Amino acid sequence: MAYPFQLGFQDASSPIMEELLHFHDHTLMIVFLISSLVLYIISLMLTTKLTHTSTMDAQEVETIWTILPAIILILIALPSLRILYMMDEINNPSLTVKTMGHQWYWSYEYTDYEDLNFDSYMIPTSDLNPGDLRLLEVDNRVVLPMELPIRMLISSEDVLHSWAVPSLGLKTDAIPGRLNQATLISTRPGLFYGQCSEICGSNHSFMPIVLEMVPLKHFENWSLSMI
């Protein structure tokens, strides 16, 4: 859940987001060490007038500063590729939901059900109840079962959009004429907020996404009430 003046990531609520947080910390530590080393060398160069003549043309030094960055890049690339393959893997999804982007709202269709689809519009600020989040509440939430793999099929009917839910590690482009897919799984119940993350016109910032993750029994009751 996001909170005011937040500087870090939202709490991870999916295995993918947990992996992304670990990868972020891993990469940040490497960048921090490299930056510290570079600043230290620069400070030494600026504060001393001595010159080490034997290192002005040394193949050993050139070999080190060629091989070492290559090793560092490999240490960054390997976990990154692992996460990319994890995000692309979809095995036997329990549910498929088709998401269509419009100017400026989202529509959802539960393809495993015969007639379960709806549009999701942002609730205007004037209609919010106490405790509601400004520019993030919608009239129809996407209710999904927790702890089950869900396939999201994402496209657009007009311009480029992007369907993103940060706490679940999701961000997939909605492209007219093309069907993209993403895997969604939540390890806990709750409300998860997102927004369109691709500039799509004057009301781009008024396209919120709200996922309500519930136990399977509650989802079955909700789906029966919607059909």
Swiss-Prot record:
Residues that, per the record, bind Cu cation A1: H161, C196, C200, M207
InterPro entries listed in its UniProt record: CcO_II, CcO_II-like_C, CcO_II_C, Copper_CuA, Cupredoxin, Cyt_c_oxidase_su2, Cyt_c_oxidase_su2_TM_dom, Cyt_c_oxidase_su2_TM_sf
Enzyme class, UniProt record, top EC level: translocase
Source organism, top-level taxon: Eukaryota
Gene Ontology biological process terms from the UniProt entry: ATP synthesis coupled electron transport
Segments crossing the lipid bilayer: 15-45, 60-87
Topology within the bilayer: Multi-pass membrane protein
Mitochondrial matrix topological domain residue ranges: 46-59
Keyword Transport (UniProt): yes
Residues bound to Cu cation A2: C196, E198, C200, H204
Coiled coil region boundaries: none
Residue positions binding Mg(2+): E198
EC number(s) stated in the UniProt entry for this protein: 7.1.1.9
Segments in the Mitochondrial intermembrane topological domain: 1-14, 88-227
UniProt catalytic activity: 4 Fe(II)-[cytochrome c] + O2 + 8 H(+)(in) = 4 Fe(III)-[cytochrome c] + 2 H2O + 4 H(+)(out)
Function description: Component of the cytochrome c oxidase, the last enzyme in the mitochondrial electron transport chain which drives oxidative phosphorylation. The respiratory chain contains 3 multisubunit complexes succinate dehydrogenase (complex II, CII), ubiquinol-cytochrome c oxidoreductase (cytochrome b-c1 complex, complex III, CIII) and cytochrome c oxidase (complex IV, CIV), that cooperate to transfer electrons derived from NADH and succinate to molecular oxygen, creating an electrochemical gradient over the inner membrane that drives transmembrane transport and the ATP synthase.
PANTHER family in alphabetical order: CYTOCHROME C OXIDASE SUBUNIT 2 (PTHR22888:SF9), CYTOCHROME C OXIDASE, SUBUNIT II (PTHR22888)
Protein name: Cytochrome c oxidase subunit 2
Biological source species: Oryctolagus cuniculus
Gene name of the record: MT-CO2
